[in-house]
């Protein structure tokens, strides 16, 4: 599961409200659950706050002080640039699956760019957008990410849905483009919201824009404005689809019309992310940590079993040889005694 730009917008709004009028400092950063980072925040006279960042999923507030991995890898670079820094704000570039965390340090302003797409990335830049460190280096046609280079956002593909204007639909019926594609190309909005909006107003996603009636265009406008109101409201409720103990999908609106999944309403987006994703990632971490120990136990059990088998074989052979020796001491001919035995007789010549 990954968060869309719309859910990230809601999360960042909530995070900023949590730090209003407070002097909050970054106490420490931990790498947890392999590819997640836990930011431990401190404010005088108040309980500690935790922010979880998983580049493959998103960002959320957490109440869990979970087990930490060894202090190796990228977390050391984050600490070097950011420890004891004052947290200023969280920011989202319009329509992007990106969160920018602003800090004030003794060396000047620092920003953490958290990119939640294409496997994710975490980048630290200074006030001049110079990259100080990055989780992953990148070199593609439109931008490069490596220490020392200047950070650039990925090319903007569409306008943020929060900037929607009524006039945007004024000339929509002049194009032959399919309505779902038109919305996706013009606005930064995930496919699941497009499909739900069109289902609610009973417009097939393959319909050509130039076949839409004035009433259908008006209904489309109403639904888009409704989604924007949900985004910008203080209501943190969310709709969740689960697969057992794992969150399969998360949405600011009920997608029960367009999806076969069953969605249940929850009162807190942040709590759902923390209670299910954090705990699930923690279980995965615990399982992974136990694997080497389990493998060692399996190897030890195999070794013990082989040693027991070897001991029993040697014991049986010793008993057999003792019996043969007893019989030989009483017999006149060893040939008759050893006949049929799996014993090799070696004769030595003087």
Where are these regions (language model features)?
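Extended, highly charged segments
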Residues: 1-350
